[in-house]
């Protein structure tokens, strides 16, 4: 089985991308990166990401993929498509917004696979004094200015070598507070109970707003784009800290191990 995700054949991956190979390896299934495709490979699974749109499906189809398996992927931007025109199985999509935009059957489960990380990689928090700034990969600029505004102690680069993911995951989970505008940094913080806020400064890109709606509607938390650490801490304490998240075991239970 092939697995397609952004930068899947690179040594350095975006933070959220690491979740795809980690979960696949956790289940011990036989899989390869899409970049290793041979003419005999005709099936592909899509897990973490916001690329569930027409261009992705069509490009994969043109490369010889005939059967698609979706477990957690969500709609971000791009054109919608009629799923009935493809041989495509939906085991899990990211949220209700994705289901609505693609007009998918209501019985398809929802949830982002990132939320199962504490189940497959348990970490006992040992809180450090680090206040981390972990911006989206497109917002990793003007760090000196941002440090003055946000008063963080440590910068967390979301572009991480494959062999450093678990080390960086521990750093994130053990931090005192996280300031971010990366969706999967936010998801991991929620999943592990790490205090965090979503902060967007002037000039920073708000990447794929619909993906944020997908996730935060699923959790039931009112998203706020904060402009300072103090505003973010207040949002965390009032909106997030005591808010329960849906049971994530059901996400793990939907994994289609039988297709491998």
Language model features with spans:
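Active-site anion-handling motifs in enzyme catalytic cores
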Residues: 1-260
């Amino acid at each position: 089985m092939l697995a397609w995700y952004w930068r899947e054949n690179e040594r350095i991956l975006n933070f959220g991308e690491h979740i795809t190979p980690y979960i696949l390896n956790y289940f011990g299934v036989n899989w390869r990166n899409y970049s290793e495709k041979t003419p005999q490979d005709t099936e592909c699974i899509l897990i973490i990401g916001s690329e569930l749109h027409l261009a992705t499906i069509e490009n994969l189809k043109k490369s010889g993929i005939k059967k698609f398996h979706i477990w957690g992927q969500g709609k971000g931007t791009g054109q919608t498509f009629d799923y009935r025109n493809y041989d495509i199985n939906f085991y899990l999509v990211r949220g209700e917004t994705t289901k609505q935009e693609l007009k998918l059957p209501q019985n398809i489960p929802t949830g982002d696979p990132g939320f199962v990380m504490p189940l497959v990689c348990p970490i006992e928090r040992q809180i450090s004094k680090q206040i981390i700034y972990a911006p989206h990969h497109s917002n990793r600029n003007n760090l000196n200015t941002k440090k003055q505004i946000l008063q963080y102690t440590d910068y967390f680069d979301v572009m991480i070598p494959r062999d450093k993911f678990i080390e960086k995951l521990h750093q994130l989970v053990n931090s005192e507070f996280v300031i971010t505008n990366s969706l999967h940094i936010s998801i991991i913080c929620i999943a592990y109970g790490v205090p965090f806020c979503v902060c967007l400064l002037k000039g920073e890109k708000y990447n794929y707003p619909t993906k944020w709606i997908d996730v935060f509607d699923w959790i039931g938390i009112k998203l706020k784009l904060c402009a300072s650490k103090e505003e973010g801490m207040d949002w965390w304490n009032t909106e997030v800290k005591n808010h329960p998240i849906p049971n994530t075991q059901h996400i793990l239970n939907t994994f289609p191990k039988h297709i491998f």
